[in-house]
């Protein structure tokens, strides 16, 4: 139901056709008109807030590599964005979270265009699949921290140990690659069946997060196609990329 209008002369025609299409499909002529961003960057800012109004950001991550409009490779920090733009996004993310009185871990998502103007999309009030890369570069256990926050611990407590934004440091680079049970020859549609052979990659600077990845596992159509997450870390981005590639090459899934 989305239409891209590149010329002003086409605006009225496309507008009317979209309204007609909406009426037939949903019984309403209501449509939304938004600025079109061509091949934008998808950048997220991770935040963490306690029950006492304290909120910090845990820097950002780039989630632009996608298939079927869903993420498949993420890395942190989002170093291809200019420093001053990133700092503005950090400030806006914290400001928005404070405005709504947000508590716990959350993610604010932005689109960044070719001129590095950024646009807020939405906020996800939960831990996301790609939180791992943020954990690797900050050393903050986001899952543990959100549980402690829910129990009533302030960020400044010895259990969480984030007294101010200055306590959150960004060190090195992390990359996450999602290994999924999908068929790349069929537009990445989810596949099902029994895993006959499973072998994971490993090595220094490699983290694996998985649940159903093992020999004999039955992959059903009732759950997400994500099998395992391979996360690499290094002080140097190119080295982190080499580690990720090696771990992916070592991974074997047959079925």
For each predicted feature, which ranges?
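ATP-dependent carboxylate activation and anion-phosphoryl transfer catalytic cores
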Residues: 4-255
């Amino acid at each position: 139901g989305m239409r891209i209008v590149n010329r002003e002369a086409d605006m009225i025609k496309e507008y009317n056709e979209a309204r007609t299409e909406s009426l037939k499909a949903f019984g309403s002529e209501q449509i939304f008109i938004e600025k079109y961003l061509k091949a934008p960057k998808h950048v997220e800012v991770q935040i963490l807030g306690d029950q006492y109004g304290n909120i910090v950001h845990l820097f950002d991550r780039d989630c632009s590599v996608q298939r079927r409009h869903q993420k498949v490779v993420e890395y942190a920090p989002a170093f291809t964005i200019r420093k001053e733009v990133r700092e503005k996004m950090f400030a806006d993310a914290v400001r928005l979270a404070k405005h709504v009185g947000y508590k716990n871990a959350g993610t604010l998502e932005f689109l960044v265009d070719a001129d590095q103007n950024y646009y807020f999309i939405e906020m996800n009030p939960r831990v996301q699949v790609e939180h791992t890369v943020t954990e690797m570069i900050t050393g903050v256990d986001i899952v543990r921290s959100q549980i402690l926050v829910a129990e009533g611990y302030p960020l400044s407590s010895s259990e969480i140990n984030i007294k101010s934004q200055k306590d959150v440091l960004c060190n090195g680079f992390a990359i996450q690659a999602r290994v999924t049970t999908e068929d790349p020859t069929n537009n990445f549609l989810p596949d099902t069946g029994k895993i006959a052979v499973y072998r994971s990659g490993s090595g220094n600077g490699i983290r694996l997060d998985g649940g159903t990845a093992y020999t004999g596992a039955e992959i059903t159509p009732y759950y997400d196609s994500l099998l395992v997450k391979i996360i690499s870390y290094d002080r140097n981005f190119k080295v982190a990329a080499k580690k990720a590639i090696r771990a992916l090459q070592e991974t074997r899934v047959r079925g």
